[in-house]
Amino acid sequence: MAKEEAIEVEGIVKESLPNTMFRVELKNGHVILAHLSGKMRKHYIKIVPGDTVKVALSPYDLTRGRIIFRER
């Protein structure tokens, strides 16, 4: 059985939470809880409120996501 494809959407970080968790408001208005991806943790990429980020959502739970890219 193949792994389901992640849904990639853009959003703006609204709040920084403990343990590299962030509250992100998506372009469609939904607010989700997102954590930092492993590569971003490894390379110490900092995320602050107000940053535009790309989030990967699982098709099974659309309220949680993984931040995979920070726009410059």
From Swiss-Prot:
<dbReference type="InterPro" id="IPR004368">
    <property type="entry name" value="TIF_IF1"/>
</dbReference>
<dbReference type="InterPro" id="IPR006196">
    <property type="entry name" value="RNA-binding_domain_S1_IF1"/>
</dbReference>
<keyword id="KW-0648">Protein biosynthesis</keyword>
<dbReference type="InterPro" id="IPR012340">
    <property type="entry name" value="NA-bd_OB-fold"/>
</dbReference>
<feature type="domain" description="S1-like">
    <location>
        <begin position="1"/>
        <end position="72"/>
    </location>
</feature>
<comment type="function">
    <text>One of the essential components for the initiation of protein synthesis. Stabilizes the binding of IF-2 and IF-3 on the 30S subunit to which N-formylmethionyl-tRNA(fMet) subsequently binds. Helps modulate mRNA selection, yielding the 30S pre-initiation complex (PIC). Upon addition of the 50S ribosomal subunit IF-1, IF-2 and IF-3 are released leaving the mature 70S translation initiation complex.</text>
</comment>
<keyword id="KW-0963">Cytoplasm</keyword>
<dbReference type="Pfam" id="PF01176">
    <property type="entry name" value="eIF-1a"/>
</dbReference>
<dbReference type="GO" id="GO:0019843">
    <property type="term" value="F:rRNA binding"/>
</dbReference>
<keyword id="KW-0396">Initiation factor</keyword>
<comment type="subunit">
    <text>Component of the 30S ribosomal translation pre-initiation complex which assembles on the 30S ribosome in the order IF-2 and IF-3, IF-1 and N-formylmethionyl-tRNA(fMet); mRNA recruitment can occur at any time during PIC assembly.</text>
</comment>
<dbReference type="InterPro" id="IPR003029">
    <property type="entry name" value="S1_domain"/>
</dbReference>
<dbReference type="GO" id="GO:0003743">
    <property type="term" value="F:translation initiation factor activity"/>
</dbReference>
<dbReference type="GO" id="GO:0043022">
    <property type="term" value="F:ribosome binding"/>
</dbReference>
<keyword id="KW-0699">rRNA-binding</keyword>
<protein>
    <recommendedName>
        <fullName>Translation initiation factor IF-1</fullName>
    </recommendedName>
</protein>
<dbReference type="GO" id="GO:0005829">
    <property type="term" value="C:cytosol"/>
</dbReference>
<keyword id="KW-0694">RNA-binding</keyword>
<comment type="similarity">
    <text>Belongs to the IF-1 family.</text>
</comment>
